[in-house]
Amino acid sequence: MRPSRRAPDEMRAVSLERGVVKYAEGSCLVKFGDTHVLVTATLEDRLPPWLKGQGRGWITAEYGMLPRATLERTRREASAGKQTGRTVEIQRLIGRSLRTAIDLEALGERQITVDCDVLQADGGTRTASITGAWVALADCIRWMKARNMIKTEVLRTNVAAVSCGIYNGTPVLDLDYAEDSEAETDANFVMTGDGRIIEVQGTAEKTPFSEAEFLALMALARKGVGRLVDLQKMAVA
């Protein structure tokens, strides 16, 4: 039995609310159960120096957690003077994932910066961030289209992410913190709207897992991502 009493293939309640920040070109408040992330997408007429003059744009991301997003207060990284390795890893993952969804040449020589701020953390902050970031990015693209800044289709596919793991010997979908902290195996799957794989991160925390168990996790992930993509489409409709 899962601590949440969910079925093995049951996700937490998920919501994606688009357009929640009036100043940002794109935004989304994403909730995976008790994990809440505010995502904004900012259009900028600048590029990394190495990309200038190449006729294409760029998508980059930043990720952070509010001090009381967790049970005990976490010191702000800005006050510590450096980002943790975990933060750097997650924001690079978000940026990589979103770039697969975009025709960077159609975007033109512009940069979209996606900021993911975790308001409350209960497991799966990176997967929630990626899923909500796609909605914020789509919201930003819509803003650009409304102002005739782009003429062709920029978004190529949906991108969503979900966690899976082996908990008490059973493959389960969308781990919350209680499950993640006790799981024998946990993995994050980032996929496109048609089920292609962008990235897989998987770790045996206690016992090595078999190929059959990995395939069971992937099957759960495909089901979860399919559900998330449906919710994304509803959010941007």
Curated annotation (Swiss-Prot):
InterPro entries: ExoRNase_PH_dom1 (IPR001247), ExoRNase_PH_dom2 (IPR015847), ExoRNase_PH_dom2_sf (IPR036345), PNPase/RNase_PH_dom_sf (IPR027408), Ribosomal_Su5_D2-typ_SF (IPR020568), RNase_PH (IPR050080), RNase_PH_bac-type (IPR002381), RNase_PH_CS (IPR018336). It catalyses: tRNA(n+1) + phosphate = tRNA(n) + a ribonucleoside 5'-diphosphate. GO terms for biological process: rRNA catabolic process; rRNA processing; tRNA processing. Phosphate binds at residues 86, 124-126. Its EC number is 2.7.7.56. Keywords: Nucleotidyltransferase, RNA-binding, rRNA processing, Transferase, tRNA processing, tRNA-binding. GO terms for molecular function: 3'-5'-RNA exonuclease activity; tRNA binding; tRNA nucleotidyltransferase activity. Homohexameric ring arranged as a trimer of dimers. Belongs to the RNase PH family. Phosphorolytic 3'-5' exoribonuclease that plays an important role in tRNA 3'-end maturation. Removes nucleotide residues following the 3'-CCA terminus of tRNAs; can also add nucleotides to the ends of RNA molecules by using nucleoside diphosphates as substrates, but this may not be physiologically important. Probably plays a role in initiation of 16S rRNA degradation (leading to ribosome degradation) during starvation. This is Ribonuclease PH. The lineage of its organism: Bacteria, Pseudomonadati, Pseudomonadota, Alphaproteobacteria, Hyphomicrobiales.
